[in-house]
Amino acid sequence: MNSTLRKWFPLVLFAAAPALLFAQEKQAAPKLTNEQMEHFLQTAKIVKIKELSVGVTDSRRANLDDGTLQHSAHVQSIDEHKAKFEGERGTEMNFVDTWMYNIAAYRLAGLLDINDMVPASVERKVDGKPCAVTWWIDDSMMEVDRKKKGLSSPDPDAWNHEMYVVRVFDQLIWNTDRNLQNLLIDPAWHIWMIDHTRAFRLYTSIKEPKDLVMCDRKLLGKLRELDAKSLAALKPYIGNGEIKGLLARRDKIVAFFDNQVKAKGEAAILYDRPAR
């Protein structure tokens, strides 16, 4: 559970057919835009909901139906705020674990043009409580299961390029809970980042500088564009303190990669991640 991201770059052992690796659903969902997924999540009827056996409390899977499309969603209502929290990773002051950060992470991913790696998430009341309702990634396996089975991506370069995005994003949002259950792998071996309820800390430092290795060229450009005005799109799910910390970390991340490019050259540091 506490493995670092650096340990998540396997050598290619073999390429297995996705149909053998993932449990298939009866009918694949049609390709939708993010806006269409958001609308579905906010308006479709919840026909069934149950607690998840994996993960934290206040986490459920709902089956949604709008009369045309049926799809599942991840429903989270956790909203804890503690002055002091004692966890397995030590003591944390000003601890926050909230559904609101899931929506903030999705909106931030949109600003960075990496919302093809963070599933759509919207606010909706479920059983009278405000929740984050997040698009369910069909036919996926968790990173923890991939490691247990000894499976590796058939395209190590594509895998690494997506994992570098994960690293940069987690340092930007100061994610304290990126574990092997919070990364999903779909049948095309694309990585999805989920469950950001313990992110957006107030710190201005970088949590794990060693995790910054390479960066997608477009992502670096989008990082430069972030400012208080654009990040207002994340409110009310994060406040001014979280935005201030995020921008300070952004400055450090951009400066780090700029210095690395000067020292090692663009080819060693920057790459172009293809569209998914």
Annotated model-derived regions:
Residues M1-V12:
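Bacterial N-terminal signal peptides that target proteins for export
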